[in-house]
Design a protein with these regions (language model features):
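Short N-terminal alpha-helical targeting/association segments
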Residues: 1-7
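Active-site histidine-anchored catalytic micro-motif
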Residues: 3, 17, 21-167
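Intrinsic-disorder-associated, low-complexity terminal segments enriched in Asp/Asn/His/Tyr and depleted
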Residues: 5, 12-15
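Serine residues within intrinsically disordered or low-complexity segments
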Residues: 8-10, 19-20
Length: 167
């Protein structure tokens, strides 16, 4: 495939490519889409189901087949896929606190001038981003899968990047 043109408008970029199938050449349009979502969790930690916002971005993009990358743009926040079940979220809280307890804050070398070393570790465990396939204009999830924003050092605005590529 060979790119022959590139133009951009608003949040969208269109890459036109040529491809040959059985001696015929056709031009296809590959779109990209970018949007930032902002969150301000009022507590130190929390989980937000952001699937509806991601689905809205997908509708906005017009992409029917492709991939979506969703990533936290802060080092004490996470984006992950799991079930939207409150008991599971409580289990995450307990498990993460056992792995990287907030207190005593003096146990961490990072805590010089701040007390969020545990939040960095929790983010590392839960992950930075997810990639989801788009099929027929929909997120191609398994049973019960949803996309979550995980906050581990809240009480301020943080961004999540949504980036899509497809046609």
């Amino acid at each position: 495939m060979k790119r022959i043109n590139r133009c951009s408008k608003s949040l969208y970029h269109h890459n036109y490519v040529t491809s040959s199938y059985g001696g015929k050449t056709r031009i296809r349009c590959m779109k990209t889409f970018r949007k930032e979502l902002w969150f301000n969790v009022p507590s130190r930690r929390g989980f937000i189901n952001i699937t509806p916002q991601i689905e809205e971005c997908l509708r906005e993009s017009g992409i029917r087949e492709g991939l979506i990358l969703v990533n936290a743009m802060h080092i004490t926040a996470s984006v992950f896929i799991n079930d939207d079940e409150s008991g599971l979220h409580q289990d995450f809280e307990v498990w993460l606190e056992k792995l990287a307890p907030h207190a005593p804050v003096a146990q961490y070398r990072h805590n010089v001038g701040e007390d969020n070393a545990d939040a960095h570790l929790k983010r590392q465990v839960m992950g930075r981003e997810v990639v989801v396939a788009v099929t027929d204009g929909k997120l191609d999830f398994g049973t019960w899968e949803q996309i979550f924003y995980g906050e581990f050092d809240g009480r301020r605005k943080k961004r999540v990047l949504v980036k899509m590529i497809g046609e």
